[in-house]
C-alpha cells in the first residue's frame, strides 16, 4: 500500500533497527499504514497476498486472516497459501516468503 501510494516502503516507516517495532502488533502497523494512505488521498480497492510456507498451513486460518487484514487495511484483502512441498530452504522451514500487490483508488 505504501509503494502504490508513493509513500516509500515499510522499511522506511518501521525499520528493523527500531527497537520500538520489535514485537509490535502487525495489525496496528497496518492500521497506521492505511491511515497514511487515506491521508494521501487514496483508498484500498483490494490487496492480494501470497504466503509461501510449508508449515504451518494457511488454510485453517485463511478466513480469519482475511477478515483481520481487511478490517485493518480498510478494504478487501485476500490471502493465498502456497507450499514448496519440502523443496529448498523454505521447504526445510528456514524461512517464509510473503508477496502482496495492492490496488488503490483515488478518493
Regions found by a protein language model. Name each.
Residues 46, 57-63, 67, 71-107:
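C-terminal binding/interaction regions
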Residues 1-72:
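RNase III-family endoribonuclease catalytic core
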